[in-house]
Amino acid sequence: MKYFILAQILFLTCLVGFAQQVMLADSITKNPVSYATVYDAKGNVIGRSDMGGYVNLQKGHEYHISHIGYAAKSFVYNDESIIFLSPSSYIIPGVKVTAKKKKYYHCKVFFRSIEHVDSCLKYYMDGIREFYIDTKSKKVHCGNVVTNYFMSKRKDIAQKKRSMMIGDKYMALPFPDKNTLYEETMRDKKRNIESGIVYADSISIGSCEVYPDKNEMLLSIDALWPRNALVTNLFGYTQVLSKHNKTELYRCDEFHAPSVFNLKSANSYRHLTLTHKKENIVRDIDVEDVFYVVEFKYTDTKELSSSNVLQEDYKKYSGMFPVIERIREQLVREE
């Protein structure tokens, strides 16, 4: 009898620690939310929801969810089969387009780039950057930028000695592509959007959600398709890019396809593995880059913003798009 009781206790203990598959869904449409980033109580990245919105969570554990199209959510998982996320909304202070077409589209973006190494937070960067985009050619011209660099306070992460000479910083400054994901999708004869699903050669590679009440569109794709991985070899090092997800949020209407001039925010997530053929070292690296368009106007001249103006913009907009506290409290400014 005592062995039976012991077996039951062990069984229940295993259940408590067992990761359960949970769907992340839109609180209004009830549709799955793909490519949301999930952090644990320490701010370590534990994964991303897949194209079906699924992610593995453990009962009784604290989690934090981040997605450019939804309000951040923090909670303790209690055995729910669906976790609902509320769509976020922010208004961009923009200047209306006049009858005369201007030469440039001038926009400012608030951005952040977060890098985890072996699931632990290591590097963080954020700031404000401005762009001038030619309204005819859509060529992107970079303006001024204000950037802040941070790294982990943890000495075992920040000060870890590496025998590998190659750097492990994969963070990147924001730079909008000439064409949006939507435009690239519609131009590719192998791709199409049907019933909210992005298909490539009849294979589901992403999702497309339209919000008529907000005149917005959210498009997410697997940017690696048709590859399963991208392998790069250099000086004995092997870098494997095994995940690359992209998401873009647009202001849209029924008359125009979403272009770079309608882009509201963008997210790019990469998972890489770094190894060396002569060293017994493996680095798992997760990098998430995100930016939000916070101001825009159309103009005929390129008048770059001063450093003081961008610093004030940073103070204003970093409060609008705060990073989760579990990440912020781990950071120290990089010297």
Regions from the language model: what does each represent?
Residues 44-52:
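Short, acidic Ser/Thr/Gly-rich low-complexity loop/linker segments typical of extracellular
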Residues 82-335:
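Surface-exposed, low-complexity/disordered segments
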